[in-house]
Amino acid sequence: ENTSVLGTPDVLGYNSHQYFFTVELKIANGSKVRLSPHQISFHILHPKNAFILVKTKADCRLYSGSQVRELFEKGLSVKPIVRGLRESCLYFENIGK
């Protein structure tokens, strides 16, 4: 958790295609995904190559930063970009390909 700049995602990544991306890491409690106002604001202001990776009891789900409002309001009923940790890693690696 970055306390210097509130809302900054947990992961600042850079792939082999020289594309920068961010990932907010979350653990779902039931069907809800808790996001702070600062985290929501970050993803609204920086929707490109910004992601939210949510760990559920069953799997991991990757959401686009542009889905942040819907994810906050509707929780896990929102359709993710991909499901699974491996699939999420492949998605990050293919940004900009």
Question: Where are the regions that the model predicts?
Answer:
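Conserved catalytic cores of phosphodiester-cleaving nucleases, focusing on short active-site segments
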Residues: 11-13, 18-29
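Nucleic-acid nuclease catalytic cores
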Residues: 45-70
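Charged phosphate-binding loop/patch that engages nucleotide di/tri-phosphates or the phosphate backbone
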Residues: 77-97
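Acidic, Ser/Thr-rich peripheral helices and adjacent loops at domain boundaries
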Residues: 70-76
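Helix N-cap / beta->alpha transition motif
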Residues: 36, 63-67, 84
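Beta-rich catalytic cores
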Residues: 7
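A short acidic/basic microdomain associated with nuclease active sites
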Residues: 1-4
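Mg2+/Mn2+-dependent nuclease catalytic core
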Residues: 28-47
